[in-house]
Amino acid sequence: MALQLLKDGKTFAEINSDEPKICFLHGWGRSSNDFIKILNKFESIAIDLPGFGKSEEPENSMNPKEYAEYLTNLIPDTVEVLVGHSFGGKIAVHMSFIKKYEKLLLIGAPLIRNNRQANFNFRLNIYKFLNNLNLISEKSKEKFKNKYGSEDYKNATGIMRDTLVKTVNDDLSELLPKVNTKIELIWGENDTVIPLSIAEEA
């Protein structure tokens, strides 16, 4: 099995069936390779999301809903189950409002914003405001990134950094009660990035 280029000519995926029933969506900074060990156990497809793995970056920054719209038109109509890890879980929830699926399996997905994310977003908005006024030195910019930025934020650049900010700001708390698709949650009890309390509240 090898990566195949999908019909958009930009996005790659691991596909082991002409009519895959399960679509795997990886987390931020990851790739379809995360699912290689289980891919062959199912009729499935695992996407390298735009901007990750072998897939090209999007032309403009995207939020999870825009990823969902893009992918819904890209994956085979035979897909019945979406498996989303972290960032991929957010995308899966949005996809369920575009097309009917039998089940969403969400693994450590940041469905609602926690206090740490909210605090970071508040600081980031102030930082952007001051930066637009040219009131922040290069040294201060670097200090801000090192102090408040997550590893994902530090590693992302350009379009993908803007995409990350949009992803963090995407709060699904109002959407979740409206989901008509069966959802199963898988969480790590000791997950410190997306704590178990997020799953309990969702």
Task: List where the protein language model places each region.
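Conserved alpha/beta-hydrolase "nucleophile elbow" surrounding the catalytic nucleophile
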Residues: H26-W28, F52, E80, G84-G89, ...
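Conserved HGGG/HGGXW glycine-rich cap/lid loop of the alpha/beta-hydrolase fold
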Residues: I15-K54
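Flexible "cap/lid" loop of the alpha/beta hydrolase fold
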Residues: K90-L135
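Conserved alpha/beta-hydrolase "acid-adjacent" motif
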Residues: T192-I198
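Conserved alpha/beta-hydrolase catalytic His-Asp/Glu region
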Residues: Q117-A118, K128-T181
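A short loop-to-beta-strand scaffold at the N-terminal edge of the catalytic core in hydrolase folds
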Residues: L5-N16
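Active-site loop/oxyanion-hole signature of alpha/beta-hydrolase fold enzymes
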Residues: A46-V83
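Short beta-strand/loop motif that positions the catalytic acidic residue
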Residues: K178-V179, L185-W187, D191
